[in-house]
């Protein structure tokens, strides 16, 4: 009896697995995936550069310039120092609607210097800054995606404008607020954002609210979004 049940269950699984259709990817999406695969080495090099600069809020001069220069070299019109912030920039290609924007960050965090080859605390510079939230990946992958979309617009396969926002000081001082006040996002139709994490998925997600006040904590520190229960 057990053998019969096991055989039936196995046949059921086999039928369902073979019956599932392979998801179709449209031509434009496949072109973007192919373009990003071809840019793998140069984007990895760019990400490693930003990681090595270890620049904190509003000090991201080399990081911002590396990303802005990459955009410029790939045909984007780049506006540097927007909203009165030397390390903020906007890169744009195309014309008209829709205006599709992609966010990028690149600031490091103080005190998180860490060698890439170690999973235990092993700073490059004791007490120095480091990429604690993967913003070297954030900025680089976003500009890579924008570049791949730009190539489709250039080839006449898409219409509209693709825009990359280089946003400094996400972790401290909130550079995006100053960019919002300047109206830099007012004409955007769709803004896309992402963040390094332990899952690969697309979703709509809420964020922590911000009220500006001073608090002094004692005890064990923890990340407010990722593991508040450990603090």
Feature-to-residue mapping (PLM):
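Short polybasic/polar patches that bind polyanions
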Residues: 13, 52, 72, 180-181
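Short, glycine/serine-rich, charged loops/turns that create anion-binding
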Residues: 11, 107, 169
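Histidine/acidic-residue-rich, glycine-tolerant segments that coordinate divalent metal ions
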Residues: 120-130, 136-137, 153-231
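Hydrophobic alpha-helical segments, especially transmembrane helices
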Residues: 3-4, 48, 136, 177
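Acidic/His- and Gly-rich active-site-bordering loop/insert found
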Residues: 21-131, 140-160
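General alpha-helical segment detector with a strong preference for membrane-spanning helices
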Residues: 6, 109-111, 138-140, 199, ...
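A generic alpha-helix preference that emphasizes hydrophobic side chains
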Residues: 16-18, 47, 176
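Bacterial Sec-dependent N-terminal signal peptides
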Residues: 1-23
């Amino acid at each position: 009896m057990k053998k019969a049940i096991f055989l039936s269950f196995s046949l059921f699984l086999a039928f369902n697995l073979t019956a599932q259709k392979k998801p179709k990817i449209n031509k434009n999406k496949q072109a973007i995936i192919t373009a990003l695969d071809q840019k793998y080495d140069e984007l990895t090099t760019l990400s490693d550069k930003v990681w090595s600069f270890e620049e904190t809020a509003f000090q991201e001069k080399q990081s911002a310039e590396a990303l802005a220069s990459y955009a410029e070299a790939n045909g984007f019109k780049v506006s540097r120092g927007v909203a009165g912030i030397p390390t903020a920039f906007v890169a744009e290609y195309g014309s008209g609607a829709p205006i599709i924007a992609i966010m990028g960050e690149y600031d490091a965090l103080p005190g998180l210097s860490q060698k890439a080859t170690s999973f235990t605390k092993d700073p490059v510079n004791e007490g120095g800054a480091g990429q604690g939230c993967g913003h070297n990946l954030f900025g680089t992958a976003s500009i890579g995606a924008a570049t791949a979309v730009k190539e489709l617009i250039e080839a006449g396969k898409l219409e509209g404008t693709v825009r990359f926002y280089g946003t400094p000081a996400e972790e401290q001082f909130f550079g995006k607020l100053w960019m919002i006040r300047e109206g830099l996002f007012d004409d955007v139709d769709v803004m896309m954002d992402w963040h390094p994490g332990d899952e690969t998925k697309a979703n709509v997600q809420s964020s922590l609210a911000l009220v500006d006040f001073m608090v002094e904590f004692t005890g064990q520190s923890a990340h407010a979004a990722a593991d508040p229960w450990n603090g």
